[in-house]
Curated annotation (Swiss-Prot):
Annotated compartments: Carboxysome
Entry-linked Pfam families: RuBisCO_large, RuBisCO_large_N
Cofactor(s) needed for function: Mg(2+)
High-level lineage: Bacteria, Bacillati, Cyanobacteriota, Cyanophyceae, Synechococcales
Subunit structure: Heterohexadecamer of 8 large chains and 8 small chains.
Miscellaneous information on this protein: The basic functional RuBisCO is composed of a large chain homodimer in a 'head-to-tail' conformation. In form I RuBisCO this homodimer is arranged in a barrel-like tetramer with the small subunits forming a tetrameric 'cap' on each end of the 'barrel'.
Official protein name in the record: Ribulose bisphosphate carboxylase large chain
Catalytic activity: 2 (2R)-3-phosphoglycerate + 2 H(+) = D-ribulose 1,5-bisphosphate + CO2 + H2O; D-ribulose 1,5-bisphosphate + O2 = 2-phosphoglycolate + (2R)-3-phosphoglycerate + 2 H(+)
Gene expressing this chain: cbbL
Record's cofactor remark: Binds 1 Mg(2+) ion per subunit.
Residues the entry annotates as binding Mg(2+): 193, 195-196
Gene Ontology cellular component list: carboxysome
Record-annotated site: Transition state stabilizer: 326
Amino acid sequence: MAKKYDAGVKEYRDTYFTPDYVPLDTDLLACFKCTGQEGVPKEEVAAAVAAESSTGTWSTVWSELLVDLEFYKGRCYRIEDVPGDKDAFYAFIAYPLDLFEEGSITNVLTSLVGNVFGFKALRHLRLEDIRFPMAFIKTCGGPPSGIVVERDRLNKYGRPLLGCTIKPKLGLSGKNYGRVVYECLRGGLDLTKDDENINSQPFQRWRERFEFVAEAVKLAQQETGEVKGHYLNCTATTPEEMYKRAEFAKELDMPIIMHDYITGGFTANTGLANWCRENGMLLHIHRAMHAVIDRHPQHGIHFRVLAKCLRLSGGDQLHTGTVVGKLEGDRQTTLGYIDNLRESFVPEDRTRGNFFDQDWGSMPGVFAVASGGIHVWHMPALLAIFGDDSCLQFGGGTHGHPWGSAAGAAANRVALEACVKARNAGREIEKESRDILLEAAKHSPELAIALETWKEIKFEFDTVDKLDVQ
C-alpha cells in the first residue's frame, strides 16, 4: 500500500471531471447551477460538487484504496453556459445508483444538497433538476392513491376539484371552525382545508377541531348528496403524535388528511404516505417553507426537484402555485413541474425548465393544487393552465364574499362549471373569459356579487425566478 498511496491534495478535476463519460440508464443524474469563486476554473468547481456530493473529500486518503472509486464516484460529464449569465454555468453530474438507499428521498437529498452547499469554492449553488432512474423509482412507494383512485373515492369527474382554506387560519375555536367548514361545503365546494400552520394550538386543540370538522362534513354530505372532505392537518411535534392524529381521522371516517412535507421532513412524509396507503386514506401535501429553499434563482433547490421528490415520497395532492394569483411562479415553469407530478413520461424541455427526460413508469400521478390569491375572475385561466386533474382552492376568494362563505362557495362552483361547459363546447375560455363569467352571473346572484367585489384585484408582479432561456 505504501508504494501506491500518494498522500497530499490534488485537484478535484483530475478524478471527478470526466467529459467522455456516457451516463448509464441506472445513474441518477443531477443538474446544478454553479457560480464559483473568482479565479477557480469551471471544471474544478463542477468536479468539486461531484466529489463532495459523492465519494470525495479535500485530501487524498489511504482508505480510497479499499474502495472501487471508479464504480462509486460521482462524475461531472458535461458543463454548459447559463444563457444571459456570464458567471454561472450548469454542471451535469452522474451518480451511480448504489450511492443511495433504496426508496429514501432523505438519503438522496442528504448527499446531493448536503455539505457541498457550504463549500468555500462556490459563491452560489442551485440544484436545478434530477433525473431519477427507473431502478430507483421502483423502490419508492409514491402517491398512496393517485389521481384515478382519488376521483373514484370522491366521485368527482370531468372537472377540477374545488376547495378552500378556512379563514382566518388562526384563532377560531373548534366549534366556529367547524361552522365555517360547513358553510363552505354546503355552498358547493368539494373540499375544505386546514391551513399549514394549524396543528394543535391553545385556541384550538387538534382533537376538538377534528370532531367538529367531521360533524360539518357529514352534515354537508347529507344536505347536498355529494361526497365532501376536509384536509385534516396531521403534522405534529413527533411522528408518534402524527400517526395518533391520522388514526383518529380514520376513526371519524374522514377521507383525507394533510401533511406539511418540507417542515415535517421527508422521513415523516414517507412514513405517513405508507400509512395512508395501508389504511385507504388520501394525503394532501402542503409545501410550507419551500420558497426559503427554491425562490433565489442562484442558490438553493428548484421547486421542480422538490415536486419530483414529493411524488416519490408520497402524496396525492401538492400545492404548486397559481401563476395568476399572489404567489411566485411563471406559466411555463409551473407547467413543467405539474407535468412531473401527473404524467407517466416527461421529455426534456428547457422552455419548461426540464433538463432531463423523466420516465415515471406506472407510478400514480399527483393532483396539482392551485391556491393563493385567486378569485372568480381567475377561473378561466386556472382551468386552462391546470386542466381537470387539479384542485382549485379559493380561501379569501370564498370567505371574502359580501354574503358570506356559503355564497362565496356557490359563486366559485357556478364559475367553474360555466368554464368547464364553455371549454367542452369548444370555446377559448381565456380569450372569452369575461363573456363566459358574465353570462353565468345572469343566473347566479352570488357570482354576480363576487365578480363585482373582485374586479379590481390583480397580482401583477414580475417573476423573480425566471427560466434561463434565450
